[in-house]
Amino acid sequence: MCIRDSLPPDTGDKQYFKILSALAGVRPKGAMPLQAVTNSLSGRFSRGSPVFIISSCEGDGTVPAAVRDLVGRGHEVTVLSPSSVDFERLVSRIPRMSYEVLKLERQNRLTTLAGSGAQVIDWMPDMDLSQALMQVRGY
């Protein structure tokens, strides 16, 4: 899906499957700040509709403001944040002290988002997507 793609409103397990299928085909592209994206799309969101953000929350200082704005407009915001710090640790040798500092910085970013009213999921590399999403659905 790209910014212009959307799914028609629906409910239930069928809609959940449609969402998961659409997310499976998503590929990152562009470098537009999240707040610019949410500002341009907010007119298409019904008041109170859930908004799902997949982001490492790194390198874009507009993420906290975008989340605050969405929550302030009455949206239920969920942030699924793949842990690039832990992934990087799996594939390279990050010195322990550097890892601890990066991990703490990441935790502070996620805590800020949670404090803004978003449900935040710290998605670890060893966790299946379905496991992470179960945290959202409350299973």
Task: Label each PLM-derived region with a short phrase.
Residues 4-139:
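Exposed, interaction-prone extracellular/peripheral surfaces
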